[in-house]
């Protein structure tokens, strides 16, 4: 089900019941946009404060006489807190256990497991700085920001924990963040930062000075994972980086890239 509509009728069962005791509920119309609505599901709340199932109705039904007795009400409404995703959200990323993640400004969002339309506000996490990009790795979700990076981990969207990684390196290019499997790489002011679990370091420090790195205009980098290498394009060329092996430069330009897992190209 979707998130519930606002309450559509209030009925004082003691002093304001209609004749015969059965209220007539006027239902909202179907939106004019193509919403692919199959049924309307009616719930009722009584003294317990919990909305319980009353009936399934066809989309075009405009009124319903509610004659269902209290002891015949069905299960509780599961979608009370299933908020729509924030319209500003970007960076949609799949996590294990059917969870999706996205972000806007300094806020990280999570969906309900296997319910990509449900994004409870109560699951959101705030960060000290605006988020630049996110990437799912085997150790958790790497969140790079305009300040320090963070690692977020958890098995369910309502129990995610965030820790700040001990490397004072912001992300200077959102498209530079790449999942490399057990770790992620991203472009910082001083070089490529490798974030592996709770550990993070500038991985290119031994092969490139800060001055050499800055001359490559790291804020223009967009990068991809290919054959275990970090393949990056920037305004001026291309390079492939492999931790422990070094960096190779190529005279190639590209505006975008895509990894085809079927052909491994």
Task: Enumerate the language-model features and the residues they cover.
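Disordered, low-complexity "stalk" and linker segments at domain junctions of extracellular
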Residues: 1-106, 110, 116-122
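Beta-sheet-dominated scaffold domains
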Residues: 128-265
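Beta-strand initiation motifs
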Residues: 50-51, 72-77, 115-120, 157-162, ...
């Amino acid at each position: 089900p979707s998130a519930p509509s606002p309450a559509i009728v209030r009925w004082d069962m003691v002093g304001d019941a209609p004749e015969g005791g059965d209220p007539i509920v006027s239902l909202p119309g179907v939106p004019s946009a193509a919403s692919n609505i199959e049924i309307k599901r009616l719930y009722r709340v009584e003294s317990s404060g919990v909305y319980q199932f009353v009936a399934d109705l066809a989309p075009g039904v405009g009124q319903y006489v509610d004659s269902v007795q209290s002891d015949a009400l069905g299960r509780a409404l599961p979608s009370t807190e299933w908020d729509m995703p924030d319209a500003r959200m970007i960076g949609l990323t799949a996590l294990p256990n059917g969870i999706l993640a996205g972000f806007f400004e300094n806020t990280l969002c999570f969906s309900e497991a296997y319910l990509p339309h449900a994004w409870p506000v109560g699951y959101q996490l705030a960060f000290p700085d605006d988020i630049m990009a996110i990437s799912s790795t085997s150790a958790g979700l790497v969140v790079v920001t305009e300040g320090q990076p963070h690692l977020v981990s958890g098995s369910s969207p309502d129990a995610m924990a965030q820790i700040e990684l001990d490397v004072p390196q912001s992300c200077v290019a959102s498209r530079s963040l790449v999942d490399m499997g057990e770790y992620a790489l991203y472009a910082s002011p001083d070089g490529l930062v490798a974030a592996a679990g709770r550990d993070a370091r500038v991985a290119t420090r031994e092969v490139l000075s800060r001055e050499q790195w800055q001359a490559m205009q790291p804020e223009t980098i967009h990068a991809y994972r290919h054959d275990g290498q970090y393949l990056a394009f920037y305004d001026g060329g291309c390079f492939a980086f492999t931790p422990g092996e070094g960096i190779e430069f190529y005279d190639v330009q590209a505006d975008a890239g895509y990894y085809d897992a079927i052909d491994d190209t």
